[in-house]
């Protein structure tokens, strides 16, 4: 069937208008295949059906995701924990020993009236039925159980304390808890099955400023890398080599988590995107994107 000249002009114009409206209205999108997953949230609606919200996490306030509790006037509250997980599982490895590469980015706003903001935000990967551990407010970032609730009979099992069998995380830690191995300054860190980070880097957290976290796993080099940056050029970078198939189950979920304790801060997520693919070496190492 022939297409008129008027119709041929209309199609590209219509396509442009549609794409423009998607950008203006910040429409989220996702694609899901057996061995690949992509999603992008440019804003969060009040009824965000493709997220699993846990604890104090809420969506819809100014189009943002609030991971921890805030008052009606937006003030942060203490002793809060919340998480958001994408609903679809991720195929992170398969029996042929092929492991997925992935790329995650989120923008965030941490704001605190306290002289010591606490406690931070983490991007994490865990088993598909993951839930918030008991006692994981404050320094444990909603990811790891507290020593006081891990007990063997009446004795605390310190080997199990602060550990989780199926957690890989990149933490943006705003408050140094040196008693659990933190360096004595705000930092970013890579956590493998424990809140005691395998690798850390000093982070100049900017109170009330929007920052960006970019996380990459290159399955060819088995390197997990992260960069946290601000518009003024300040950044922190950390990397650690890990075989994800030795740490995580074959199918996982990805999420964002945050907590407050005695000190407090808002833990606001403005956008979040994620892409993973098995048998892919197309996702670059962090050094090529910074």
Swiss-Prot record:
The mature chain consists of residues 164-281 followed by 30-148. To form a mature chain the precursor undergoes further post-translational modification after removal of the signal sequence; cleavage after Asn at positions Asn-148, Asn-163, and Asn-281 is followed by transposition and ligation (By formation of a new peptide bond) of residues 164-281 and 30-148. Pfam families: Lectin_legB (PF00139). Residues 149-163, 282-290 form a propeptide. Keywords: Antiviral protein, Calcium, Glycoprotein, Hemagglutinin, Lectin, Manganese, Mannose-binding, Metal-binding, Mitogen, Signal. Mn(2+) binds at residues 171, 173, 182, 187. Transmembrane segments: none annotated. Residues 1-29 form the signal peptide. It comes from the Eukaryota. Ca(2+) binds at residues 119, 173, 175, 177, 182. The record marks 148-149, 163-164, 281-282 as: Cleavage. GO terms for biological process: negative regulation of DNA-templated transcription; positive regulation of cell division; positive regulation of mitotic nuclear division; regulation of defense response to virus. Glycans are attached at residue 152. The keyword Isomerase does not apply. A carbohydrate binds at residues 119, 139, 262-263. GO terms for molecular function: D-mannose binding; metal ion binding; monosaccharide binding. Binds one manganese (or another transition metal) ion and one calcium ion. The metal ions are essential for the saccharide-binding and cell-agglutinating activities. Belongs to the leguminous lectin family. Glucose/D-mannose/rhamnose specific lectin. Has hemagglutinating activity towards rabbit erythrocytes. Has mitogenic activity towards murine splenocytes that is inhibited by glucose. Inhibits HIV-1 reverse transcriptase with an IC(50) of 35 uM. Has a potent antiproliferative activity against L1210 leukemia cells in vitro that is not inhibited by glucose. Inhibits translation in cell-free rabbit reticulocyte system with an IC(50) of 2.08 uM. Lacks anti-fungal activity against M.arachidicola, B.cenera and F.oxysporum. Homotetramer. This is Concanavalin-A.
């Amino acid at each position: 069937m022939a297409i008129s000249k008027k119709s041929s002009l209309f199609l590209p114009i219509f396509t442009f208008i549609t794409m423009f409206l998607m950008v203006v209205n910040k429409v989220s999108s996702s694609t899901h295949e057996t061995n690949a997953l992509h999603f992008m949230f440019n804003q969060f609606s009040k009824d965000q059906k493709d997220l699993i919200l846990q604890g104090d996490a809420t969506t819809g306030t100014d189009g943002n995701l609030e991971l921890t509790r805030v008052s009606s006037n937006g003030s942060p509250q203490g002793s809060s924990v919340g998480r958001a997980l994408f609903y679809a599982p991720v195929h992170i490895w398969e029996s042929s020993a092929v492991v997925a590469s992935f790329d995650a980015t989120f923008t965030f706003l941490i704001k605190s009236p306290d002289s010591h903001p606490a406690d931070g935000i983490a991007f994490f990967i865990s088993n598909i039925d993951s839930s918030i551990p008991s006692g994981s407010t404050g320094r444990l970032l909603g990811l790891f159980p507290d020593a006081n609730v891990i007990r063997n009979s009446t004795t605390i099992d310190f080997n199990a304390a602060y550990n989780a069998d199926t957690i890989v995380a990149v933490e943006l830690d705003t408050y140094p808890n040196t008693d659990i191995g933190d360096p004595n300054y705000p930092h970013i860190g890579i956590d493998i099955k424990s809140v005691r980070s395998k690798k850390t880097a000093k982070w100049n957290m900017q109170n009330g400023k929007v920052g960006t976290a970019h996380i990459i796993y290159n399955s060819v080099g088995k390197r997990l890398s992260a960069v946290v940056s601000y518009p003024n050029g300040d950044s922190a970078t950390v990397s650690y080599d890990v075989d994800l198939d030795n740490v995580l189950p074959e199918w996982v979920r990805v999420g964002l988590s945050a907590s407050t304790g005695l000190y407090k801060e808002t833990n606001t997520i403005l956008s979040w995107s994620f892409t993973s693919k098995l048998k892919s070496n197309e996702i670059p190492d962090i050094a090529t994107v910074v």
